[in-house]
Amino acid sequence: MYARIVTVHAKTDKLDEVIAIYRDSIVPAAKQQKGFIGARLFIDRATGKGVSVTRWQSKEELEAGEASGYYQEQIAKIAPMLTQPPTREAYEIGVD
């Protein structure tokens, strides 16, 4: 299994909106992607920092979302609420 970790910095007054979009739009779209297992969003309300962790069956399925434009479409949904571009990383899951 693999994980994609995306770190965002949102305007603190927009965090509830970011959470709602993640829950109501981004996660349902992820569920339609082949190999998607699950997602979690961690937030720090004081700083506006958010960390999304999504789990995928394989590295190929994780990377397919980036190649197809899926990742970019999801980031575009919250981009107006961000204070800087997101960062993304991918890891093999050693222990689940």
Regions found by a protein language model. Give the residues of each.
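Short S/T/G/P-rich N-terminal loop/turn motif that feeds into the first structured element of a domain
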Residues: 1-53, 57-69, 80-96
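Low-complexity, intrinsically disordered Gly/Pro/Thr-rich segments
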Residues: 72-77
